[in-house]
Design a protein with these regions (language model features):
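Conserved functional hotspots at enzyme active or ligand-binding sites that engage polyanionic ligands
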Residues: 1-110
Length: 110
């Protein structure tokens, strides 16, 4: 299993969150010290927050969704069940911008 940034996977997030779609946001590491990925969960609970990236209607999702960067997490790759799709480069850039905002990394490039 080799999840790539921008891919959407169904992931087992445990009892509280169950199985849900997540976007992989960690870089690909050919020799990872741990078999972990960073992810942002997708949700249908839209709050129009700067921590959300609205997604267009995607054929592999049942409903319109948002990527909620406040839910950023990590999990072992063995909890990824199956890949269901991929986000476009433009949406991934919006997701990166939202992550930079959430983590207060906007000043890092100045």
């Amino acid at each position: 299993m080799n999840p790539q940034p921008g891919e959407i996977w169904l992931a087992d997030l445990g009892l509280a969150a169950k199985t849900r779609p997540v976007v992989i946001v960690s870089r690909q590491d050919p020799d990872p010290p741990r078999a972990l990925v960073l992810y942002v969960p997708l949700t249908t609970q839209r709050r129009d927050s700067p921590y959300e990236v609205p997604l267009p209607r995607l054929p592999f999702l049942d409903r319109e969704s948002v990527a909620n960067v406040q839910g950023l997490g990590s999990l072992p790759t063995v909890r990824l069940e199956r890949k269901i799709g991929r986000l476009s480069g433009g949406i991934m850039q919006q997701l990166k911008d939202a992550l930079a905002f959430a983590l207060d990394l906007e000043q890092a490039s100045e």
